[in-house]
From Swiss-Prot:
One Pfam family, short name: tRNA-synt_1
Keyword set includes Aminoacyl-tRNA synthetase: yes
Annotated domain remarks: IleRS has two distinct active sites: one for aminoacylation and one for editing. The misactivated valine is translocated from the active site to the editing site, which sterically excludes the correctly activated isoleucine. The single editing site contains two valyl binding pockets, one specific for each substrate (Val-AMP or Val-tRNA(Ile)).
InterPro entries linked: aa-tRNA-synth_I_CS, aa-tRNA-synth_Ia, Anticodon_Ile_BEm, Ile-tRNA-ligase, Ile-tRNA-ligase_type1, Ile-tRNA_ligase, M/V/L/I-tRNA-synth_anticd-bd, Rossmann-like_a/b/a_fold
Cofactor binding comment, as recorded: Binds 1 zinc ion per subunit.
Chain's gene name: ileS
GO biological process, one term: isoleucyl-tRNA aminoacylation
GO function term, MF aspect, one: ATP binding
Stated name of the protein: Isoleucine--tRNA ligase
Organism of this sequence: Mesomycoplasma hyopneumoniae (strain 232)
Length: 886
């Protein structure tokens, strides 16, 4: 008989499930399929009566194309939502967008110039809405399980009105107050900033040691003695109105040359080196409290200022004497208030000096450092000047340096709700305890929250001032009236109407004015738990999941707002992920030149491989993107796909039915149950990288052992043989498990696989299926097979030696004489399991037998020749062409 006869007699089937994925085409095909059949809506209807699981989407900013960080975040969330949905939960996912803020406002101002506030707001609103549509189109390419017709955005009248209801609640609880205090001020944005809007970048500052002359001494210091002062902000010396000492620190009066200096005793040796003092003399030693009240001459202007006590004085750096400019530092401010120091503001909103700066008027603050240093040099007041590179606060939007600057601002008191916040944090589940500490530090250690901004595009602070310029905070009916207008017309009404038109009739024509500031944009997004309609679900929601920078942002503002409004956290569990970095560990962004467009990646690899990269990343750290890492995930995908293709192809003639299994089939079936349990456990823990690794490792082990031994059965046994059906039963079980297991991560591939699976009660989509449940795993059965694998390893060491010495070409040529006393080992089909021609048992030693048997032309196994083919193939062929095989 010719070779084709033998080949055609084998159980070899073809499959339309191709090795090549063509994911880009299939992404579009299945996205259309899901939308046409309203799969998401069907899932929600099917699950509506089930337990709830809500992952609340933190709103990205509606400006520009989505970046790789956006894609990472949305995919991570989608994996959770898909898993929870398949696990039986009602889990609607409502995407949101944050729409107000400086980037959009600046973009509009650059386009149209300095127009009216109304025009800026109208254009900004239109632009934000257009950006939502653009980003929505891009997010759709990520195959998210959601309905983009059901979204929330922070610029709708209903959302804005709810936000102002929460603000009213803050006012009614006495948490909102106005004060002149130093706050982060961005000259580039010309607005106050909260801590959450600060980014620390490297910056070069002068390190200046100068001296202030004492005007009148006492028993410890004398007139014209020089106080040594250290500063990195010479521009603030204009606003100096005091010097702080540590009351209980030791200070010295020393003589160097013709001059007498005062400084902290502990810093003398260090400063003597810096100043190159080689022959100084200590004249006196005294505690800081001994010179409290001593007056000195201002370093620039002809005025006299006092020495006061300061708890913030440190002996780590400087001289132990701290220059105070009360409107340019928080500690300075409180010390200034306690000691009635002069509050000098010499910097305008744009960072330029006003008339209070005298001869330096009109200078930009940063440029004045050089001029002020030169001025002091001429007066022989500089002891040392150098420059330091250090981490310095910058505006997170413009990336320009910010300053502390005292301006009248609106605040929410955190001090008053500190205990409530601490209690709420105790109820939150964190994956790691240090994350709990991080949130606590970010929220609870704040004294207050700066909520006012001096911009146009945002939600107005709906506060009125009476005829005496005092804010009116005790009239709830006024707030209710404004909120009703905003709910009807949107927040633009505040700018379209006059003050009297915005007030209830009884408060009109009293000479009142309205506030011009807007609310912090973190206030906007931070009310989404209340203002957004999440399918009519109410907080607390199950999970908030954003980038790690949101501990100071959305996590922070949401927690504060919810505790104020509801008395509890808006989230039960908090998850965060790192930033996407390049192969060198640098954060990826367009500005750095190392940014990568997620849409380009999707076009090249397809959505499922992009999603696999996300799932296969340890997201709790920074996530590395590189071509090499993506190619690794391509290989993992290929391995999964090829395994699935093998399963589908070899199940072509299988009708789902339960079979009694042989020992090895039972062992593999048991392993599949363990696989299921581990997948469930890691999905429950949101450890997707472990899910991918568990699946990948299982496939490798499954292919190396089980598929190696059963291919012979699948291809060469009778089509209806019990052994073959037993193997197919395991293949079918694994195919179903893999199909469900990868569905949350690779929805397109899972849907394609599902179309090839035969089963009863089949759904229209795999994503409407239920996730498999935990199964019994027999540890005793699993452990029993350890003995076999030890024997297999020892046998194959001997076989490899034979192959290496070229005595044989492959294992199935040999026999094995096996030494064992194990009843279990003797009971299993060792010839199949070891893939050798013959196994016999020995009481002496294990050895390899060279048989010189014939190779079966049909199955290629080696056999002791009786017929043209081996006994098994003889039996199979005899049913096809009787008596022609002998």
């Amino acid at each position: 008989m010719d070779k084709n006869f033998y080949k055609n007699s084998l159980n070899i089937f073809n499959s339309n499930f191709s090795m090549k994925a063509n994911l880009s085409e299939k992404d579009k095909f299945y996205a259309d399929f899901w939308e046409k059949n309203q799969i998401y809506q069907q899932i929600l209807r099917k699950r509506r009566g089930n337990p709830r699981f809500i992952l609340h989407d933190g709103p990205p900013y509606a400006n520009g194309d989505i970046h790789i960080g956006h894609a990472l975040n949305k995919i991570l969330k989608d994996i959770i939502v898909r898993y929870k949905t398949m696990a039986g939960f009602y889990s609607p996912f409502v995407p949101g967008w944050d729409t107000h803020g400086l980037p959009i406002e600046n973009k509009i101002i650059n386009q149209i110039g300095s127009k009216s506030t109304l025009e800026i707001r109208r254009k900004s609103n239109d632009f934000a809405n257009s950006q939502i549509l653009a980003q929505m189109k891009q997010f759709k390419k990520l195959n998210l399980l959601t309905d983009f017709k059901q979204i929330y955005q922070t610029n709708t009248p209903n959302y804005e009105a709810k936000q102002l209801k929460l603000f009213k609640k803050m006012v009614s609880r006495g948490l909102v107050y106005r004060a002149l205090k130093p706050v982060y001020w961005s000259p580039s944005s010309q607005s106050a900033l909260a801590e959450a809007e600060i980014e620390y970048l490297e910056y070069r500052s002068p390190s200046l040691f100068t001296s202030f002359d004492i005007k009148k001494g006492n028993n410890f210091v004398a007139e014209n003695d020089k106080l040594i002062i250290w500063t990195t902000t010479p521009w603030t010396l204009i606003a100096n109105s005091g010097v702080a000492v540590g009351e209980n620190f030791d200070y010295v009066r020393i003589k160097n040359g013709e001059n007498f200096y005062v400084l902290a005793a502990n810093l003398l040796e260090k400063l003597a080196v810096i100043f190159d003092w080689k022959h100084y003399e200590i004249i006196d030693n005294f505690p800081g409290k001994s010179i409290l009240g001593i007056k000195y001459l201002h370093p620039i202007f002809e005025k006299i200022c006092p020495i006061v006590s300061g708890n913030h004085v440190s002996l780590d750096v400087g001289s132990g004497l701290v220059h105070l400019a009360p409107l340019f530092g928080e500690d300075d401010y409180w010390i200034g208030r306690e000691n009635n120091l002069e509050m000098v503001m010499h910097v305008n909103d744009d960072g330029k000096f006003n008339e209070n700066a005298g001869q330096f008027s009109g200078q930009f603050y940063a440029d004045s450092n050089k001029l002020i240093t030169e001025f002091l040099e001429k007066k022989s007041k500089i002891l040392h000047l150098s420059f330091i590179d250090h981490s310095f606060p910058h505006d997170w939007r413009t990336l320009k340096p910010v300053i502390y600057r005292g301006t009248p601002q609106w605040f929410v008191s955190i001090e008053k709700i500190k205990k409530d916040l601490e209690k709420a944090i105790e109820e939150i589940e964190f994956p790691e305890n240090w994350l709990k500490k991080r949130l606590t530090k970010m929220v609870v250690e704040r004294k207050d929250w700066l909520i006012s901004r001096q911009r146009s595009w945002g939600i107005p602070l709906i506060i009125f001032y009476d005829q005496n310029k005092e804010p009116v905070l005790d009239k709830p009916e006024i707030f209710d009236y404004i909120i009703s207008l905003v709910e009807k017309f949107g927040s633009r009404i505040w700018y379209e109407k006059t003050t009297d038109e915005l007030l209830p009739e009884k408060y009109q024509n009293l000479g009142w004015t309205k506030e011009n500031d807007i609310l912090d944009v973190w206030f906007d997004s931070g009310v989404s738990f209340f203002a957004a309609n999440i399918s009519d679900e109410k907080p607390p929601f199950d999970i908030y999941f954003e980038g790690s920078d949101q501990y100071r942002g959305w996590f922070n503002s949401s927690l504060i707002n919810s505790v104020i409004y509801f008395g509890f956290s808006p989230y039960k569990k908090l998850l965060s992920h790192g930033f996407v970095v390049d192969a060198k560990g640098n954060k990826m962004s367009k500005s750095r030149g190392n940014g990568v467009d997620p849409l380009v990646i999707l076009s090249k690899y397809g959505c499922d491989i992009f999603r696999l990269w996300v799932a296969n990343s340890e997201y709790y750290n920074d996530i590395v993107y590189s071509e090499a890492i993506f190619e690794q995930n391509v290989e993992i995908y290929r391995k999964i796909r090829n395994t699935v293709r093998f399963l589908i192809t070899n199940l072509a003639d299988f009708k789902p039915k339960k079979y009694e299994l042989t020992e090895v089939d039972l062992y593999i079936f048991n392993k599949i149950q363990k696989l299921k349990n581990e997948i469930i456990q890691n999905y429950d823990q949101n450890r997707f990288v472990r899910v991918v690794k568990i699946i990948n490792n299982f496939i490798i082990e499954f292919s190396n052992f089980y598929l190696s031994i059963v291919k012979d059965i699948l291809y060469a046994d009778k089509e209806e043989s019990l052994k073959r059906r037993q193997v197919q039963y395991n293949l079918y079980e694994l195919l179903q498990v893999l199909n469900i297991a990868i569905a949350p991560i690779m929805p397109t591939t899972a849907e394609e696989i599902y179309s090839f699976i035969q089963k009863n009660n089949k759904q229209i989509s795999v994503h409407m299926e239920e996730f498999f449940k935990k199964s019994h795993f027999d540890e005793e059965l699993d452990a029993k097979w350890d003995e076999f694998f030890q024997i297999k390893d020892s046998v194959y060491q001997l076989i490899e030696q034979k192959i290496k010495s070229k005595e044989i070409k492959r294992p199935n040529e040999v026999g094995v004489l096996l030494k064992t006393d194990s009843d279990f080992i003797k009971s299993i089909d060792l010839e199949k399991l070891l893939m050798v021609a013959k196994v016999e048992f020995s009481n002496e030693k294990t050895e390899i037998l060279q048989l010189n048997w014939e190779k079966c032309p049909r199955c290629w196994n080696h056999f002791e020749k009786i017929n043209k083919v081996c006994a098994r193939c003889f039996e199979v062929l005899n049913e096809i062409v009787p008596e022609k095989n002998s």
